[in-house]
Amino acid sequence: MNGKKILFVSSELVPYLPENEVSLMSYEAPRMVNSNGGQIRIFMPRYGNINERRHQLHEVIRLSGMNLVINDMDMPLIIKVASIPKERIQVYFIDNEEYFKRKATFTDKQGNLFPDNDQRAIFFAKGVMETVKKLNWSPDIIHVHG
């Protein structure tokens, strides 16, 4: 992995969301790649239950500001970034007020899936692709997890 550029895309990641199999694997795999000399960047949604202040997220103005079309509607794309403590790995957060402001990831308090999870997933995927283009960074490997 030495010198390889790896784009790691995940729906969940420790320490930003509670620990589970997906969030922990999405932390450990990039950490190992990074420690072996890979150049890794992680992308995940900026769910409303992620504490921006505690995790020091900040908006990247040069990457934000475009709209993505989802179901014939223009939806603003906001990009935020933070670093995983002690790992020197950048995490890019795909954000949109309509899709990600609620204080949960996939389900409501009763355990019901949000009816727009499909639109949220499409917005996230499009947001990752557009942001990588704007970064002018071409990964050698793209890994999508969770």
State what each model feature region is.
Residues M1-E19, M44-Y47:
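Nucleotide-activated donor-dependent transferases that construct or modify glycoconjugates
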Residues K5, D140-I141:
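Structural motif
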Residues V22-M32:
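Short amphipathic alpha-helix
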Residues G38-I40, V91, P139:
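Hydrophobic anchor at the start of a short beta-strand
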Residues I42, R46-K134:
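A conserved catalytic-core segment of Leloir-type glycosyltransferases
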Residues K134-D140:
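Short, surface-exposed connector motifs at secondary-structure boundaries
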Residues V144-G146:
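Short His-centered aromatic/hydrophobic patch
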